[in-house]
Amino acid sequence: MNIEKIKDTLLECYSKDLCYPKMQYRWNNDNKYFGMSLITDLIVNDYFGGNICKIYVTGISHYYNLIDNEIIDLTSKQFNFDIDYKNYEIINREKILTDDTKYRYNILKKRLVNKLLKQVDEEVFNCKLCDKLVDKFPNDTTVFIGKNNDMVLVGEAPANNGWRKSHKLWKDVNDKVLPSGVVLQKLFDIIDREIFETTFLESVKCYPLERKNLKICSKNCKNIMLEQLKILNPKLIITLGEFPTRNLLDFKFDKFADVVGNTYEVNSYKILPIYHPSPISPKCYSGNVPIFEKVRNIW
C-alpha cells in the first residue's frame, strides 16, 4: 500500500456529504477533491505519519501533509493553478477534530478501508498457489470488520465448521457459538469487550485440507495478511496460536511458550501472542487469563 493507491481509492470514496459543510453547495462530480482536504490528510496521517499543515488558498483554508519534509497534497487538483506552500502552519491533530470533522473522517476512513480490503479479497479469490492443498474460502470477504480496528485478532485458518460454512464469525451453521468463541469471549470479558465487535482475519485465507499444509499455506498467504493489516492499521494485534505468531514475528523462536504473553513491536505493530482458544489446547483459558489481565491494565 502506498500514497498513490490511497489517493486513487479515496477518489472513489468522495461524495457531497463528506465535503466541508459550508462548501457542499459548490461540490460536484467534476471536482470530487473539493472540500476534502482535511479529512483526507487525517487519513494520510494515520497511515504515514508526519504533520498536517494549513495554508490559505484564495482565502479558503486548505490542508496538506508534510512527511519527511516532502509535501503530500492529495487534494491539490481541486485548484486549477499551482499552490504556494510557503506560509504554512502545522496543525494539532486533536484540535482540528471537531465533532463534524470526526464524523466525516470516520465515514471516509470506513469507505476507504472497505474498498482496499475488497481489492485484497479479489487477490485471494484469484490466487492459485494452494489450489490442491485447500478448499477455497467461499465468503465474499476474508476479514470481519468490528466496531473499530484498534484491536485485530489473527487466527490460524478457517475452521471446517466455522464461518466458511455459516458465513458468521465464531458461529457454526446452526448459529451456535463455536467452542473457541465461547472460550475467547470468557477471556474478552476480562477486558470488557465483545468478540463479535472485534476485527478478525485469518493467517491462512482458505481451509487447508490437511493440517500439515498449514505451514506452506501460511507462507503463501503472508503478504496478503500483511497487506490487510496495513489497511486496518491496528494498535494491537493478538495472534491466536503458533502459526499466525510465527507468520508475524520477525525472529525465530523454538517454543511457542517462550513468546506467548509477551508484547513485541514489529513494523510499528504491537503483537501479543496468546494460546489458541480452542478447547483442544490445555491452556486455552487458564494460560490466557494472566495475559488478558495484563491487557486490561494497559489497554
Role assignments for model-derived ranges:
Residues 117-299:
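A polyanion-binding, active-site-adjacent surface
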